């Protein structure tokens, strides 16, 4: 069991200090406007506390992935829209369209106490001036980490969503600065998820969806030891159903994961894994985009002919009923991954019914970020859960009981 006993904001003398904060402002942007500012809002508690401590505050974040010079020169992945949003929420916010070099050093020097400076997308450093993909941020370049660390007295990691990665903007800074701590958001995340890994109230029920078994393999293996039931839907159930010898038509699955799926099912001696066995399907040959696929019919995987022209896009009524019966008895619940193509009204029912059942239960319930959080928001049910994590991959890594490098790098109490 991993217990993170890390310094928090309250454990460090921050008065009048220059503080560099890794935030997660990786938000959706359309037409140069932020269309969902949840992550910006969630960072405000930490930023406002630092303002109260009379700090000079430097903010770092990534936005999307940077794969070419075009990604930079087009400014489509610039944090400027984030700055425009942030300055409606805070006074004294500045933005610099750079994050390394002389201008950055000067801008930080000129910062006044209680001012906030947002630097440009950290991943601009993943491509050099010649267009070569060098991944200085994503591969934790020591030189980059040292530069950012040199700007401040204290480093605060408040980006839970990237804490499962060792980047220059989290691990790199922490390794090169004399004081580091976690922010309020990361603190909340660790406390909320720890309730599921440290003696959870039982029954402890896990619902896993999404497309790939490969993404969830480690978490399934870990949760087989700690959970009472693991309910599996979404695209990943196709690989398990295929491994059981059921027919899945033309549904997407991972051929390279079939043997692993068989092994997991064989190791499940206590029958903790409950698979969605009926699904809502549509004619595979007519699908151009799953998000606009027409309504289909319900089929049971074990009854279908092998080469039938169908693709499963949601769990069916029987599976919904079975899953809801386990959810009703649960005292702790972790949900990661939608159970169908919830963006399509014809295939949102599985995710909606399960989200609604969890929201109505008396259990301690956590959504593990990512698409399941997006689904809960779409159904206007997110506020009915005990906690909604900001990190899909990071929450899974935490539930795997694997070390989160971005947290591990922070000084212990």
UniProtKB/Swiss-Prot annotation:
SUPFAM superfamilies: Phosphoglycerate kinase. GO terms for molecular function: ADP binding; ATP binding; phosphoglycerate kinase activity. PROSITE patterns: PGLYCERATE_KINASE. It is an enzyme of class 2 (transferase). Pathway: Carbohydrate degradation; glycolysis; pyruvate from D-glyceraldehyde 3-phosphate: step 2/5. One of its GO terms (cellular component) is cytosol. The keyword Kinase applies. Keywords: ATP-binding, Cytoplasm, Glycolysis, Kinase, Nucleotide-binding, Transferase. GO terms for biological process: gluconeogenesis; glycolytic process. Its main location: cytoplasm. Monomer. HAMAP family: Phosphoglyc_kinase (MF_00145). This is Phosphoglycerate kinase. The lineage of its organism: Bacteria, Bacillati, Mycoplasmatota, Mycoplasmoidales, Mycoplasmoidaceae. The gene is pgk.
